Amino acid sequence: SGTDVYVGGGFTNVNNNGTSLTAADFVAKWNGSAWSALGSNGASNGSLGFSVYTIAISGTDVYVGGLFLNVNNGGTSLTAADYIAKWDGTNWSALGSDGAGNGSLNNSVFAIAISGTDVYVGGAFTNVNNNGTSLTAADFVAKWNGSAWSALGSNGASNGSLSTTVYAIAISGTDVYVGGNFTNVNNAGTSLPEADRIAKWDGTSWSALGSDGAGNGAISGVSVVNAIAVSGTDVYVGGSFSNGGSAPTADYIGKWNGSA
């Protein structure tokens, strides 16, 4: 963001030119010349308790997702900040809760993407508890609008559309591209077997990005999509796949132009 670079991972200390930053556990900022921590636990250690897997920025707000189960904001324990939290430049805060002081998500966050006030989150979670209301359709991907969580569609039977973990999210306009190791998307009761590892949510429905010509997904091999980036109508996809549909040489990275 500007000249600031935010970094997350499994590190437990940052050494800034000879000065140990013990509060820079798992997340830190580089301003072009020096490292700094994002807050502390009030006792010179970091605010986060475990690894950070993803970071997204909107204005001055930094959204962090990972495996941490708690955030300590200057000595105050935020038990609702499980797996995802927001840093506003001064303080940490949670994104909602389960209505009982715990976090809304029940497992790790691997991907965050932001569009306006909407924060899209993907990961290994199988449920989102929105202030006491269980969102059983919010499996592996969900949206936070600043005040409440919601699911992206369902399987038509109150469960989620995706079958397993989401590792990547990218947004273009109203389209949300989601990648992971899921092998099927169920769009309100309609199975989309060609939506293997990557799919698009247009705000109303899920759809596949092409196919192998036989009704299966375009991406094959020992497959997982780890990264997605969008430029205009082009969608770039990276992962461990060894084939990209009609492009057999598309190992590990491929481009979808909207039709091929």
List where the protein language model places each region.
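Extracytoplasmic surface signature
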Residues: S1-A260
